[in-house]
UniProtKB/Swiss-Prot annotation:
Homomer. Forms protein aggregates. The two isoforms can interact with each other and with themselves. High sequence similarity is required for their interaction. This is Meiotic driver wtf9. The gene is wtf9. Pfam families: WTF. Promotes unequal transmission of alleles from the parental zygote to progeny spores by acting as poison/antidote system where the poison and antidote proteins are produced from the same locus; the poison component is trans-acting and targets all spores within an ascus whereas the antidote component is spore-specific, leading to poisoning of all progeny that do not inherit the allele. Keywords: Cytoplasm, Endoplasmic reticulum, Membrane, Toxin, Transmembrane, Transmembrane helix, Vacuole. Signal peptide: none annotated. Belongs to the WTF family. It comes from Schizosaccharomyces kambucha (Fission yeast). Residues 1-39 are annotated as: Disordered. InterPro entries: WTF. The keyword Transmembrane helix applies. Residues 11-29 have a biased composition (Basic and acidic residues).
Length: 357
């Protein structure tokens, strides 16, 4: 049996073979189609029509995205042409007026000279009409440019403000951290240098207070409320510094707690002193203020030495005061209950005998 060779032919070849002798009068004769090449398609085939349609659609389609602001402006222009023209004219006139007043302010100092007058009339007679025509004709172009410029400027200013705020926040944070570290290092250094610096500061405070007392007693310095407030502040600041030095492990809450305790004790002394002075019908003169200042001075020294000898005593003071008050109230209650129990335990016979008598 002999093998027969049949050349491979596509469906396109068969269709072209059938239509070799058929000529369409409208389309003209078909060009030769090479199936081996495959680069060209029959011009009247369905595939060719589809490719042509797709290419036309892609070529005629929109290639750029339009701006919505431009679309709205175009719609307004098409729907209200007269109003749009009036707006263009009004904005153009306003722009020219701004330019005119700017030129007038610049030329006004030179109006006394001939050059100034000529420049002013040239600006009015030539520049302003040309500028008005230019602005009116190129209204859309320069308005878009101005809007874009304003937008870029606003964004730039917002970025500048944002960067400035962030930088300031970082600077404040770094400064606070640096100050806290400096205070910590100073406190630790003073704590490691034993107690000599604390004693030196205390002695300096004593000298200042005694100087104020002597000046007020024998000099021309009147001892008044300002000195009392300064004494309170000095003693409170001393205690606060003492807490930094002696107790570096304290937190800020504990430091301010000790500060308020000292101020509270000093305030109580001042109130009691004033109350006693008014009770005995004596005015608070220099002697009364001297008593108050001396009392505050003694209390400040007492708290200083107490904290030096017993570190953390002021921290335990509120608890001790609460325990003392609770113990006092509890003892008073027990005493009252004991008295009532003794009255209830009296024998009935004794009460009857007393009633008979």
């Amino acid at each position: 049996m002999k093998n027969k060779y049949y050349p491979l032919r596509s469906s396109m070849d068969e269709m072209s073979a059938k239509n070799d002798n058929e000529i369409d009068l409208e389309k003209g004769p078909l060009p030769e189609y090479n199936s081996e090449d495959g680069s060209t398609l029959p011009p009247y085939s369905e595939i060719w029509k589809y490719i042509k349609t797709v290419s036309e659609d892609s070529s005629t389609g929109p290639t750029e995205t339009t701006n919505p602001n431009v679309e709205r402006r175009q719609e307004f222009k098409d729907s209200h042409p007269n109003i749009y023209s009036l707006l263009r004219l009004l904005i153009s006139v306003l722009a020219v007026i701004v330019v005119f007043f700017t030129a007038w302010v610049c030329v006004n100092p030179l109006e006394k000279s001939i050059f100034g007058k000529v420049a002013f009339f040239v600006t009015i007679g030539i520049t302003c009409p040309i500028l008005l025509i230019t602005i009116f004709c190129f209204f859309e172009t320069w308005t878009q440019a101005v809007a874009q410029c304003i937008k870029v400027t606003v964004i730039f200013l917002a970025q500048c403000v944002k960067v400035t705020v962030i930088s300031l926040a970082k600077c404040v944070k770094v400064t606070a951290i640096s100050l806290a570290k400096c205070v910590k290092v100073t406190a630790v250094g003073l704590y490691n240098s034993r107690e000599k610096w604390v004693v030196i500061i205390w002695l300096l405070w004593v000298v200042i207070c005694y100087t104020l007392f002597l000046r007020s007693k024998f000099g021309n310095l009147n001892l008044n409320k300002a000195l009392i407030c300064s004494t309170c502040s000095i003693s409170a600041a001393l205690l606060l510094f003492l807490l930094y030095v002696r107790l570096p492990f304290w937190t800020l809450k504990h430091m301010f707690s000790g500060l308020f305790q000292v101020l509270g004790v000093q305030s109580c002394v001042v109130i009691v002193t004033k109350g006693l002075m008014h009770l005995f019908d004596k005015h608070i003169d220099a002697t009364g203020y001297e008593i108050e200042a001396s009392s505050l001075f003694v209390i400040g020294n007492f708290l200083f030495f107490y904290e030096m000898e017993c570190p953390g005593a002021l921290r335990r003071m509120p608890k001790s005061i609460r325990n003392g008050i609770a113990s006092f109230l509890e003892g008073t209650g027990k005493a009252i209950r004991g008295a009532n129990d003794n009255n209830n335990n009296i024998p009935l016979e004794e009460t009857e005998a007393e009633s008979e008598v």
